[in-house]
Every structure is written in C-alpha cells, then in structure tokens.
C-alpha cells in the first residue's frame, strides 16, 4: 500500500519522497526542499491526532523546544507548518543508520562503543537541560 504522503508537496516547498520512520505520534519522511535544494526530514503528526488539542500542543511545544537548541548531537529545525489539515516539522536530515540498527548489526556492543554513544547522548541532554528543556 502506497503511503498517501509520498509525492505530496508541503507549503509548495517540501516534496516528500520516502517514509523513513514511524512513531507513536508522528511519522518521519525524507523530502526535498526545492527552494534550498537540500534533503530534509519532515515529521508529520498522524491524522488521528490532528483534532486532539493535547497532541497538537505537545507537537507544537516539541518544535519550539528543539528550535532553540544548537548542538552537534541534536538535529536542527528548519521550518514548521501548522494548518487545519496538517502539522509538520522540517528538520535536518541525517544520512546513515540509527543507533538501534547499529546495535542490531553489531550484536553485543563493545564497551568502548557503548560509552561513546552514552557520552554523545548525555552531551545533547545536558545542552537541552542547560536551556530549561527536559526530555
């Protein structure tokens, strides 16, 4: 079954090309920013939550919180869109595999790799906490 968002153009600018992640609250797509000629990630709130004021509030708060952060271990927010029909966050696209995929490929993580990843995650969390954001 074809995802209804594939091929969709948001704000006349972001052309969705591929589904890359499925979450509980939103799905994440790879897209082309045709104005800036770059690949981006677009997080779209699932339609079943589009009329739920609590989910809308949380989604908007997430975009505001991330937008103020500037850290190498945190994706950058480029744009947001909140209309009656769709709510989305446009973010930096990071090419590669997820930490989960890396761990599945490696089997048991080497302790040095585990420490490396934990340090990177903690640095990002510390940066957010320093700015009053709790994850």
Regions found by a protein language model. Name each.
Residues 21, 61, 69-73, 86, ...:
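Flexible N-lobe loop architecture of eukaryotic-like protein kinase catalytic domains
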Residues 32-39:
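Conserved N-lobe loop of protein kinases adjacent to the ATP-binding glycine-rich P-loop
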Residues 80:
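Activation-segment/catalytic-loop signature of the eukaryotic protein kinase fold
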Residues 117-118:
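Activation segment signature within eukaryotic-like protein kinase domains
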Residues 46-68:
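AlphaC helix of the eukaryotic protein kinase fold
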Residues 84-98, 102, 106:
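Conserved short submotifs of the Hanks-type protein kinase catalytic core
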Residues 16-23, 28:
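Protein kinase glycine-rich loop
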Residues 121-133:
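Protein kinase catalytic-loop region centered on the HRD/HxD motif
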